[in-house]
């Protein structure tokens, strides 16, 4: 799995990573078990494997899931959350805001005049996370 390689060669190289300021984010094209209350897919569904690895083998915290427990936050034009922001507990303590931006501009709209898979402004919604790094310096 690509995510295993990525994690082992980045955060996996830092013995005290949970106490350091690490972040990993992106379009992972996979689902999180933390959202399975919404998806209701079988426990052995392969779409959960990538995020399972991150949650089980790294100190990373899923920022959106932690900030909005019990509230599904779709990040695409359909009801899926495949974009993730992870950070270590030390950095999570600095989070002041975390949200998937949903407004008239960020609402994905298919544009049939262009390519069949073209969405305006994007097929993904932006995720905003604000960190107050002054809090990290005090620790």
Language-model features: where?
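Active-site beta-loop-alpha substructure in enzyme catalytic cores
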Residues: 1-9, 24, 31
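Metal-dependent phosphoester-hydrolase catalytic domains
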Residues: 12-23, 30-139
């Amino acid at each position: 799995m690509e995510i295993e390689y990525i994690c082992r060669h980045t955060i996996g190289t830092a013995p005290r990573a949970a106490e350091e300021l690490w972040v990993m984010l992106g379009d992972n094209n996979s689902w999180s078990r933390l959202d399975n209350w919404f998806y209701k897919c079988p426990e052995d569904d392969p779409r959960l494997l990538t995020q399972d690895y991150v949650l089980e083998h790294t100190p990373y915290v899923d920022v959106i899931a932690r900030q909005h427990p019990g509230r599904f936050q779709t990040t695409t034009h359909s009801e899926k959350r495949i974009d993730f922001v992870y950070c270590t507990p030390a950095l999570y303590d600095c989070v002041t805001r975390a949200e998937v931006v949903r407004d008239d501009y960020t609402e994905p709209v298919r544009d049939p005049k262009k390519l069949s898979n073209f969405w305006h402004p994007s097929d993904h919604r932006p995720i905003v996370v604000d960190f107050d790094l002054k809090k990290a310096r005090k620790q």
